[in-house]
Amino acid sequence: MKLVIAEKPSVAQSLAAVIGASARKDGYLEGNGWRVSWCVGHLAGLADADSYDPKYAKWRYDDLPILPEHWQMVMGKDKKKQFDILKKLMNAPDVTEVVNACDAGREGELIFRSVYELAGCQKPMKRLWISSMEDSAIREGFANLRPGVDYDGLRDAALCRAKADWLVGINATRLFSVLYHRTLNIGRVMSPTLALIVQREAEIDTFKPVPFYTVALELPGLTVSGERMVDKAAAEQLKEACQGAAVTIKKVECKEKSEKPPALYDLTTLQRDANRLLGFTAQQTLDYLQSLYEKKLCTYPRTDSRYLTGDMADSLPVLVNLVANAMPFRKGIAITCDPQTVINDKKVTDHHAVIPTRNLKDADLSALPAGEKAVLELVALRLLYAVAQPHIYSETVVIAACAGREFTAKGKTVKHPGWKALEDAYRAKMKDAEPKKEGAEKALPELTEGQTLSVVAAIVKEGKSSPPLHFTEDTLLSAMETAGKEDMPEDAERKGLGTPATRAGILEKLVSAGFLERKKSRKTVQLLPSHDAVSLITVLPEQLQSPLLTAEWEYRLGEIERGQLAPEEFLDGISTMLKDLVGTYQVIKGTEYLFTLPREVVGKCPRCGGEVAELQKGFFCQNDSCKFAIWKNNKWWAAKKKQPTKAVVSALLNDGRVRVTGLYSEKTGKTYDATVVLEDDGQYANFKLEFDQRKGGSR
């Protein structure tokens, strides 16, 4: 009997259906000499700090850095049932071999190995490595199972990544939280990513627009423009000199140009396009793509390659044809297929580019959720683009002279639309299609060198230099992908912040931690840093916010994966960095109150006349010698199922009383309205009720 372990139940069911394990059991499927079970995400993970020593339950500066000598792996608290099933299956006497069928990548490898090792399994291990959930791909994968030891490097890299995140997250978060008296979540990749955004906002805030002026001359059949000028008076003077004058055509240059189709999608490029064109977050796109993968409609999502392998060349025309037939908006557009434009074995590592599968032919696409359908459409369209003919056009550049200055005009004539015919058809069907740039394909009249033309009109156009744009998920993903790239070896496999598989999760963590805010602006959603984000980057040392260092770590993880670097060497480097950080970092003078939000004054203190401000747990006099306070969890208010709000406290402080509705009566169980009066005895803030006598004080 052979045991197959998938990453989730839906994948296990697909695998079981192909290999004939159709009998349902408790937590697994069985049949045809196979048992197929599943994890539920990460069943096991690295233990928390207090598992190594109970004293670590409390965050103390003196305990840092926390550097485990012997790492502990523990089972997830809510995952015991499925873990016990897997442990029993792995160690069953009749099981002779265990097949790792978790996702073919770092995380999938770690999910399986953690369970395998925690269960104490010693059975021979094989690896199912597939890039598609199509039945044919599954059958081929099981026919070519690989030895599990071939992926020890992948396991080592995944475990080192997890340990590095643990070390930096635990130690840096505790260090800065203790020093600045506020929980500050710091991550190996999160913090440099946040630094990119904060730096961009600083550039925007300090940007000063510079005006410029351009003189444009309207000629018969075309308009020519001069270079930008910073002196308005000089621009006006040039305009006057050109008004009514003759223009001499100095040069007419016509070139035929070709624009190659874009490469196929890797995950990051798809996430960027889905954000720009559809407004999806990176995480939404990944979720939709994962679902499509499990429905056998597209290939493995978490890839960093944009090419296919040579063994796919022969079958590609058939796939392209059926994909084209599934895209209704491409009717009337000739479809071509040049496989060589997308084949490059050297640029495919673990998985090839994301493409649709042949199951698209028989799928009911109208039954798909809207988000999945839109993402699948992008993936299908990109395949058609990538194998299509180049976009060929003729570009004409005219240089004219007037009043001793040169003016230029450009024109474009499409010779063969190529892949852009598909792009135009797709954009035409979109509700919020991006408008084409004015004059982008405007042809120029026939002109000859030496020809003279009269100036019909001369105008001065005024403009201003533009500030950098706020990050969107599209542009931030691009910045993360290229961070530190210029300083990395040319052949480096892993560059930038994070990996295609982790970037979406990093952005979501920054949002949930309150460091990033998504703000709608016209057709885009901007990513803006919070007050705490700016404060955090202000106090973080360079090594924790440097994209270069984190990009170098990603490169080192790639070396571990290839067996070129010992895991201990990588982790020792991080431990040394953390020791230096804890030993040398001091609170930056003047930043002690950076993480304290501005306090809003709600009224005057009835005892000392000082200012009363709202804090997290109540309203307090800001005079250090005065102890006046109205707590938000005050028992008198809690008994009436109310909490003193800012408006209520403000009225009590200013008028001594406030009308409150919906007070709860413990005696009757009903609610009533009354006036609450503040009575301060110098030690405690007390409250009493007054009722409108004309209504009989009815409760």
Give the role of each language-model region.
Residues 1-162, 166, 467:
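Intrinsically disordered, low-complexity regulatory segments
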Residues 9-16, 33-36, 40, 76-87, ...:
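Amphipathic alpha-helical transducer elements in NTP-driven molecular machines
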Residues 233-265, 271:
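Metal- or metallocofactor-binding catalytic centers and their adjacent structured scaffolds
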Residues 295-301:
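Secretory-pathway/luminal and periplasmic proteins that interact with or process carbohydrate-rich
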